């Protein structure tokens, strides 16, 4: 009885072609899906749009405002505040001189305003700011040093920045006034969505 030898089908060329074809489709779809994101980032950079994903303010998009009356300010912290916020990763990598990202906070007190710091929170010209009390530790139980209690008059060339949206916000309740020269730009909300923020 003779054994019949059957030649295996020639799949090399076809398989190679199909592999290249699938790879090409994958690259194409990746480019198509990434294009809107890239275009969005470019448009955001051109039109001054910032995406906020931090819990200090409602998450969403904010746009640059050329009006100094816009109370949301983007600034680079200085001194100990810059070091702590970077070491503890309150800030990501960004464009500030220390290599960290700018902070986005509401400016709540301006030159000439009276700031009263107490254990229960902060008052601006007698008006109490919700969720403004300094905490003894952060959300990971690392120690914090709140700004000393007392009455302060906001000096020329400085502002106080405090977020009432989140009691864990790292702002002037820990480092006092910031120099106006550290402000990079003013912003206003463009499109935001409310999120539940843990309070203490």
Give a label for each model feature.
Residues 2-200:
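Extended hydrophobic leader/signal-anchor segments used for secretion and membrane insertion
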């Amino acid at each position: 009885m003779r054994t019949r030898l059957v030649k295996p089908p020639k799949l090399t060329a076809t398989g190679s072609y199909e592999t290249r074809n699938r790879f090409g489709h994958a690259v194409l779809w990746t480019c198509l899906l990434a294009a809107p994101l890239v275009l969005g980032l470019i448009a955001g950079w051109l039109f001054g749009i910032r995406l906020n994903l931090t819990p200090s303010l409602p998450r969403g998009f904010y746009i640059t405002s050329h009006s100094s009356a816009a109370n949301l300010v983007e600034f680079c912290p200085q001194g100990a505040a810059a070091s702590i916020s970077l070491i503890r990763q309150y800030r990501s990598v960004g464009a500030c001189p220390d290599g960290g990202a700018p902070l986005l906070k509401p400016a709540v007190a301006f030159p000439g305003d009276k700031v009263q710091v107490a254990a229960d929170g902060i008052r601006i010209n007698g008006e109490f700011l919700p969720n403004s009390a300094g905490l003894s530790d952060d959300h990971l139980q690392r120690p914090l040093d709140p700004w000393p209690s007392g009455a302060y008059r906001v000096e020329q060339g400085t502002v106080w920045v405090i977020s009432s949206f989140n009691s864990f916000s790292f702002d002037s309740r820990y480092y006092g006034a910031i120099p106006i020269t550290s402000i990079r730009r003013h912003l206003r909300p463009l499109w935001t969505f409310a999120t539940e923020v843990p309070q203490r």
